[in-house]
Amino acid sequence: LKQKRKRHRLFGKMIGLCAGFSLLFATILIPGQALAEKQLAAPLRFDFGPGDVADGYTQVTAKDAYTPERGYGFTDLSKVNEENRGGSDAIRSDFVRVQGSSFVVNLPPADYTLSLIAGDTAGNTNITVKAESIVKVEPTAKTAGQFVEAGFELALIDGQLELYFSGDEAKINALVITPNKARTAGEHPSVYLAGDSTVQTYKSSMKPQAGWGQMIAPFFTNETIFVNRSIGGRSTKTFLVQGRLDDILRNIRPGDYLFIQFGHNDAAINNQERYVSPADYKVYLKTYIQGATQRGAIPVLITPVGRRDYDAASASFRISFPEYVQAMKETASETGVALINLSQLSVAYYDTLGLEGTLPLFLHLEPGVFPAFPDGVKDDTHFQEYGAEQIARLVAQGVRDLNIPLSSSVKTENLQ
């Protein structure tokens, strides 16, 4: 039940643009444009509390439940109350106290800057703020008369901003939502990599461990810029809730690429923080795809690279995480997004080398040879530099075969 509630919070929100926006936006949307092209023409300003309303702000009280018609409001009024301390400052003299509930606003998918004021002239404040499940305001405490003034950016994907407020005394005074200026294409495309430890770039102190993302640039022309945001231990879920996808989407430009390879940690059923079922894996992948395409970027799905998992009976290597490989292939088919089947490519490559021949690819190291691994290691998941380079070659080969604009940037002579 707990997992179902969590999934409802993450997935129950609107996916894509709704059939129409509420009356809240009727005067600020650019008339005559297709709905998908509409953007906020001016900031939205909310003044929380029952007292006087600041000029240019929309009042939000503890009685304002979210409705589609209103387009904003609280999701659970039982966890919301309000106070008015009085005074001449319309913003800071009153507030709405929120204890474990969300304030949601229907917005066009885009990038925004949010500015929040939280505090109380006569009492303490203790507040944490999550935006789209990402912690944007860490736990912060203020005494009477002090106010939290926080600003942060957010890449909105699903058409409804959700701000979740927690803390013993989360007192909201004001919120301003400002649309960011749309980015334009760069002179040359950048390729953003979103993935796990098999993709990430490692510090030199970790030699000889490497991910294929740090070895891929030589297979492409010099104009191609790779931005590797991959990091170990992440699944499609944790990469998102930790704000790593958000960081990519707030920087990616039209014409850029987003390469997506997850699966190793999504399948970790004994680690519920990371674990994502194959069905939910597809939901998360579609969120990545939607976020990229909304910003004019081109997503490319990459099935999880194979582990060194040998089947002696068939004298061949097994497909790693087959349910996730299939789920990603289905996602590519359902969305029309390009797919590189690195799972298949890597396992086929391992088969040409055999059990012993694959040892130099993976982190199988003797004790005392490398400072990062003084006791040695036998790791059939992660790569040495040579192995990472060979996997990068397979990815580049996959890009070449996709027949997308980036394909022309592959140095074919380096694939031999």
What is each residue range found by the language model?
Residues 200-208, 230-242, 268-277:
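Acidic/histidine-rich helix-loop elements
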Residues 9-24:
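Sec-dependent N-terminal signal peptides
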Residues 37-202:
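Compositionally biased, intrinsically disordered or flexible polar/acidic segments
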Residues 1-11:
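N-terminal secretory signal peptides that target proteins for export/translocation
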Residues 25-39:
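Sec-dependent signal peptide cleavage junction
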Residues 49-51, 166, 194-198, 202, ...:
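Active-site-proximal beta-strand/loop segments in catalytic clefts of secreted hydrolases
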Residues 48, 163, 180-230, 245-258:
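Serine-esterase "nucleophile elbow" of acetyl-processing enzymes
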Residues 244-389, 393-412:
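Alpha-helical cap/lid subdomain in secreted, periplasmic
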